[in-house]
């Protein structure tokens, strides 16, 4: 950042050479430059993948420590619909349901870790998680692991499934069936 900041200050000085710049005007010009820099980096990150507002805020704060322009950039991105936790949570759940064997509890926890508000998490879970698909995922994981016959193996498999975010009720239902 230091090299870029010095280059920007030199450009500002060259552009306004011979003019008297007040400290306030100089700060406004520099702030506008920082805003553009942060905005561009935000778009670069969002082009790679969708982010929650919290995730993007963390990345920008880490990269642009002490810059107060981070929050205005995030607000502008939200206004322009480039950044939206509702859309992020729906896409996240849809993607994980298609590509991972995770249950609703794990999905909820992952979204909470990404700073998504509870209302968007619940909306995404309700609209994208189908109990019959969860059941099929649990059954597939049980088949893959081999149906446990002894109680210790059943407990171990149940714990594994629980860590993946499946409900205890669903796990018990599948494990209490005859082997598939």
List each model region and its residues.
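Strongly charged, low-complexity linkers/loops
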Residues: 85-163, 170-180
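Short helix-coil junctions and helix-kink-helix linkers
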Residues: 59-66
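Short capping segments at the starts of secondary-structure elements
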Residues: 46-53
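Short Lys/Arg-rich amphipathic alpha-helical segments
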Residues: 13-35, 39
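Short amphipathic alpha-helical interaction segments
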Residues: 66-73
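Single conserved hydrophobic/aromatic residue that forms the stacking wall/gate
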Residues: 1-4, 8-12
């Amino acid at each position: 950042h230091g090299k870029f900041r010095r280059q920007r200050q030199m450009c500002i000085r060259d552009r306004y050479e011979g003019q008297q710049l007040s400290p306030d005007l100089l700060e406004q010009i520099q702030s506008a430059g920082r805003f553009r820099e942060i905005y561009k980096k935000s778009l670069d990150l969002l082009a790679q993948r969708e982010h929650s507002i919290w995730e993007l805020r963390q990345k920008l704060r880490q990269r642009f420590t002490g810059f107060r322009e981070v929050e205005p950039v995030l607000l502008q991105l939200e206004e322009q619909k480039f950044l939206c936790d509702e859309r992020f949570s729906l896409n996240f759940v849809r993607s994980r349901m298609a590509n991972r064997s995770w249950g609703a509890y794990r999905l909820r926890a992952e979204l909470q870790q990404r700073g998504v508000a509870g209302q968007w998490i619940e909306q995404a879970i309700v609209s994208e998680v189908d109990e019959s698909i969860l059941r099929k995922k649990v059954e597939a994981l049980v088949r893959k692991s081999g149906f446990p016959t002894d109680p210790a193996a059943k407990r171990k498999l149940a714990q594994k499934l629980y860590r993946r975010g499946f409900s205890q009720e669903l796990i018990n239902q599948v494990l209490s069936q005859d082997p598939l």
